[in-house]
Swiss-Prot record:
The gene is mazF. The keyword Nuclease applies. It holds the Pfam family PemK_toxin. The lineage of its organism: Bacteria, Bacillati, Bacillota, Bacilli, Bacillales. This is Endoribonuclease MazF. The keyword Nuclease applies.
Amino acid sequence: MIRRGDVYLADLSPVQGSEQGGVRPVVIIQNDTGNKYSPTVIVAAITGRINKAKIPTHVEIEKKKYKLDKDSVILLEQIRTLDKKRLKEKLTFLSESKMIEVDNALDISLGLNNFDHHKS
């Protein structure tokens, strides 16, 4: 079963513009009820092109700890919904402490804790 925090290889093509594409690792960020019953999953792209977080929506993951080819960064500003058929092989899963970092970066990316544009 697909679980929140799992890292899979996924085919993200086709893409447009600045979207992350190709076959690459992604982390499942959807809740486990959705993962069980929905034909789709919500994921965040992972890149190995940078190995240090550049902005607050980035989370670093270490290659040795997570059995990746290289030190990588989860891009929580690059989230998308995929059909489960796009998921290839499961690579690993993230620790609870790493998922707390993911949740904090998601909060920033989605503006969940500072919704104030209706204030006058």
